[in-house]
Amino acid sequence: GARVWAEQMGTVPVASITATKLRWLADAEPENAARVAAVALPHDWLTWKLAGGPAAGLDALATDRSDASGTGYFSTPRGEYDREILDLALRRDTSDVLLPRVLAANGEAGVTVEQGPIPAGIKLGPGCGDNAGAALGLEMGVGDVSISIGTSGVVAAVIGTPAADPTGTLAGFASATDSFLPLAVTLNGSQTLDKMRELLNVDYAEFDRLALAGTPGAGGMTLVPYYQGERTPNLPRATASLLGMTLTGTTRENLARAA
């Protein structure tokens, strides 16, 4: 069940992980699932192309533990692929399917070949996932927490041991180094602010001013920002609501603050 998934793999199956997408491929396009020779993530493919692509061979594919931990068939706690999960995802024996080498943060994924303006001989790192890259750039250490509001909303923390959450609220990912990076990710991020800013017909600076001028608690209003459904919690058909509106509390300032 979900607890075993969380403890053994670090994540529970959700629509965003690679294993789930491979199961869709196996069910919707079985002929293509049967042809799969390798499975790689976008940044793995880009690194591979820089290193020569087909000329380098599929064996040249490489990744890092942070992105691998989001596939669903890489065990974050054990630090290795689980072929049984990949078999289940593609509904076939995948012993002939190549998976990228998982490199350390300071590992070398290859060197560039000359392509247009790109010179030959530049060492290539393994890259990392977006949130792992953010944690690396912020120089986060064990115990540090970050909040990112972009296309999605992300709360990330660096911890020293693997996280296991059977509810799926936290995804037990790995960091780009040797620590772990559990994530709580919402589908609705900056678009929540953008929609309210659009309704108030103000620019970002004025929107900030309005929110700061609002009263603590936004005059009793609560915005449930499920404009596109939601992934955490898993409510794909949910819609947004603005609750607690009163004649005195419903002001431009409090609307901005509620968002």
List each language-model region with its residue ranges:
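Active-site core segments that coordinate phosphate-bearing ligands/cofactors
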Residues: 2-10, 16-60, 68, 72-88, ...
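Short helix-boundary/re-entrant hairpin motifs in multi-pass inner-membrane proteins
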Residues: 85, 100-102
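A short coil-to-beta-strand element that immediately follows conserved catalytic motifs
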Residues: 95-99
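Glycine-rich phosphate-binding loops at beta-strand->alpha-helix junctions
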Residues: 103-112, 189
